[in-house]
Regions:
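Extracytoplasmic gate region of multi-pass secondary transporters
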Residues: 33-34, 211-262
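Helix-loop-helix hairpin linking two adjacent transmembrane segments in secondary transporters
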Residues: 101, 132-133, 140-188
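Interfacial helix-cap and linker-helix signal at transmembrane-aqueous boundaries
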Residues: 40-41, 72-73, 155-163, 238-239, ...
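Extracytoplasmic
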Residues: 15, 21-40, 46, 230-235
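Short hydrophobic/small-residue motifs within alpha-helical transmembrane segments
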Residues: 58-60, 146-147, 257-262, 346-348
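C-terminal transmembrane helical hairpin of 12-TM major facilitator-type secondary transporters
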Residues: 278-322
Length: 397
């Protein structure tokens, strides 16, 4: 096949490059809250409950951004929505340098709004740019999100100090400004808008009038809460260990968690060749539970890194596999009507991260708060067994 070197094709390739770079930066911004939480807590003299409200602030902003994505894309196109999202993240991340708790909370709301607007916009624009290879294109795109998440902790450790995040947030602001501006210019040439008003003519299968859909949504509520709680609190949890093993300080539990999270995404297609969605989910949940148990009982950074690696690998395939189950159950067009599913995930993330901080403050021990993660895993295993048994009953009848 002769390579396509037309100006339009070259423009699309450059835009794709910028979108992947933007998604990498967005991955860093998404998990930034967990990495700066110990610094903000020390600077503002916060207990875990007060710090936990920052999670609610960010996820509230993210929920607003997700809700407003469709009308903003309709009005300004994907490029305009992404630029607005990057601008919000820029303003929010700089606001984290304030010495006022309320200003920092507002900054997390603004940052969350940018994240909630940017991630779906980049995903949808990637679909528009790759109509023939949607699945591999999205998998490759989300790999870059994972890379950004992996390097967030080392980035903050290298450029920040125990009491200041001015330098790393300033660097992120510059990257957001340059990348957002470049995406705006690159996407201006061909304004791509999603035809959200287009409804399938073939009477789509009902979704949210069924109990199965809401059970899958509850599954998403708890699981996204687990992922957010782990990613958000594991850095603080590791820093409070009485036995700090300096020999493994570089391979921190946070770094290990996100590293094996990305590796798990790569390994998932191999397992999918031999296992269906239900068995994949159960295997992932059992692996995750093992990792969480090691996390809770570990007393050195090395043991925590091991538990975080196992938990990250186990949980990595659960969200996409649950989405695949949702689509397989309700049809290929179900993703266009999956808004309640994503809302449940955002609400679960806000509740779980806050609950961990609340329990930690009341028992004066973050380990008690982290038990919420184990409870989440056990609940998900029970729910998955129920959904699996229910699906077998439905098929047999």
């Amino acid at each position: 096949m002769i390579p396509n070197h037309t100006p339009a094709a070259e423009s699309d390739r450059f835009l794709k490059f910028l979108l992947h770079l933007g998604f990498l930066i967005s991955g860093t911004l998404t998990v930034l809250i967990g990495q700066v939480l110990p610094i903000l807590s020390a600077r503002l003299l916060l207990d875990d409950t007060q710090a936990g409200y920052f999670f609610i602030a960010q996820f509230s902003g993210s929920l607003m951004g997700t809700f407003l994505t469709q009308p903003i894309v309709k009005r300004f196109g994907f490029g305009g929505a992404i630029v607005l999202g990057f601008l919000a993240m820029l303003v929010g991340v700089l606001g984290l340098n304030s010495d006022a708790w309320l200003v920092c909370a507002a900054a997390f709301v603004v940052t969350g709004f940018g994240i909630g607007l940017t991630l779906p916009s980049i995903n949808m624009l990637t679909v528009e740019l790759n109509p023939q290879n949607v699945t591999p294109a999205l998998n490759f795109l989300n790999f870059f999100w994972g890379v950004g998440a992996i390097f967030c902790k080392p980035f903050i450790d290298f450029f920040g100090t125990p009491t200041s995040i001015l330098q790393p947030t300033f660097i992120l602001a510059i990257l957001l400004f340059i990348t957002g501006l470049a995406i705006g210019f690159a996407s201006h040439r061909n304004r791509r808008k999603e035809s959200f008003d287009q409804i399938e003519s073939e009477n789509p299968m009902p979704i949210w009038t069924t109990s199965t859909a809401w059970l899958i949504a509850v599954f998403n509520f708890v699981h996204v809460g687990f992922e957010s709680g782990t990613g958000g609190w594991i850095t603080t949890y590791a820093m409070r260990l009485p036995n700090q093993d300096g020999s493994v300080a570089w391979l921190s539990p946070t770094f290990a968690y996100f590293l094996f999270f990305v590796l798990g995404r790569f390994a998932a297609p191999v397992f999918a060749r031999f296992l269906d969605e239900n068995r994949m989910l159960l295997l992932g949940l059992l692996t995750t539970t093992l990792g969480v148990i090691i996390l809770l009982w570990g007393d050195t950074l090395g043991v925590l890194a091991l538990g975080a690696s196992i938990a990250g690998f186990g949980t990595s395939s659960i969200f996409p596999t649950n989405m695949a189950r949702f689509t397989k159950t309700f049809g290929a067009t179900a993703t266009r009507r999956a808004t309640p599913l994503f809302i449940c995930g955002t609400l679960g993330a806000a509740l779980t991260t806050w609950l961990i901080g609340y329990i930690s403050t009341n028992y004066n021990d973050l380990r008690f708060g982290m038990i919420v993660l184990l409870g989440s895993c056990l609940f998900l295993i029970c729910l998955q067994v129920f959904l699996y048994a229910r699906s077998r009953t439905t098929v047999s009848t």
